[in-house]
A protein has these predicted regions:
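A structural signal for short beta-strand/turn segments enriched in small hydrophobics and glycine
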Residues: 149, 155-157, 189-201
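Acidic, glycine-rich catalytic/binding loops that coordinate metals and/or anionic ligands
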Residues: 112-116, 187, 209-276
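Bacterial Sec-dependent N-terminal signal peptides
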Residues: 1-27
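Zn2+-dependent peptidoglycan hydrolase active-site motif and core
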Residues: 151-185, 205-209
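Cationic-aromatic interfacial patches
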Residues: 23-76
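Intrinsically disordered, low-complexity Pro/Gly/Ser/Thr-rich segments with frequent PxxP/GP/PP motifs
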Residues: 66-96
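Terminal connector regions
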Residues: 87-121
Length: 276
């Protein structure tokens, strides 16, 4: 009887871990919260008819329309079509079409050599290995359960389905999805800084997938299946900026130059002044 009870406890624990892991999988973090993007036909103050899309997220979405114009939807109101009052032309949005929403926008000024920080405390050692639980390129970093997870790059926190999920959009429209954390310190809409504590590592440390919406996946008449591309960034270490080799240990370095990488000149000046 005792063995049966112990087996049930173990099975329940494993089931809970499985559900937790699934909830923090990369595919789950890409899911769009209900009604996060909605459309409305409305009239402006001059009586012109508008088709407006409202993006209630803090990050961009891409409205893809098959065989037709597509649009970037920034946070807030986006007018994608306007018919002037008493105009005689046809409304192109009245005809049937297939459309889809995707997180993000095509990257601007993307540079594969842009340096990132390791998700560990400045000066600590870490390594990465491929997270085999994910079907896309995901880096599982060597950390102890309960260790603090630090932001690898500055950006804005996007809305997700669950509070422990963390998705950050960077200035060039690349993303970092932080997976398998036990706790998330930051909230949607919050601007995080490189090296800022963002959460607590789970039983397997933390896994991060770096990715972007790939324009090349839309080169045909329709989106070619999976529309994101994943990459391994260059990381800043005590030995310099390196493309890290899997399972090799590195000394993490977070310096002022890295922290200020995506800041405007005004923000840089304010940051340096705050350190005096």
């Amino acid at each position: 009887m005792k063995n049966t009870i112990n087996s049930l406890i173990v099975a329940t624990a494993l089931s809970a871990l499985s559900v937790c892991a699934d909830a923090q999988s990369f595919q789950r973090i890409l899911e769009r919260p209900v009604n996060i993007v909605r459309s409305e036909w409305e009239y402006d103050n001059d009586g012109n008819q508008e088709l407006n899309y409202y993006n209630e997220d803090y990050c961009n979405y891409y409205l893809y329309r098959v065989n037709d114009d597509s649009y970037n939807l920034r946070p807030g109101k986006n007018t994608v079509f306007k018919r002037m009052k008493d105009a005689q032309y046809n409304n192109l949005f009245n005809r049937a079409t297939t459309y889809m929403f995707f997180r993000g926008s095509f990257p601007k000024d993307f540079n594969i050599n842009t340096p990132y920080a390791f998700p560990v405390k400045n000066g600590m050692q870490t390594a990465w290995k491929t997270d085999r639980r994910e079907s896309v390129r995901t880096l599982q970093f060597r950390m102890l359960p309960g260790d603090t997870v630090y932001a690898t790059r500055s950006g804005i926190v996007c809305r997700t389905m669950l509070p422990r999920q963390l998705l950050i959009c960077h200035a060039d429209y690349t993303f970092a999805a932080y997976l398998a954390m036990n706790e998330n310190f930051v909230s949607p809409g919050e601007e995080v800084r490189t090296g800022q504590p963002v959460g607590i590592a789970g039983p397997t440390g933390v896994s991060i997938s770096f990715f972007f919406l790939d324009k090349n996946k839309f080169s045909g008449l329709e989106a070619a299946g999976y529309v994101y591309s994943h990459f391994t960034p260059v990381f800043r270490t005590a030995e310099g900026d390196v493309k890290p080799v899997e399972r090799k240990m590195y000394n993490a370095l977070v310096d002022d130059e890295l922290i200020m990488l995506d800041m405007s000149k005004r923000e840089q000046k304010k940051y340096l002044k705050s350190k005096k």
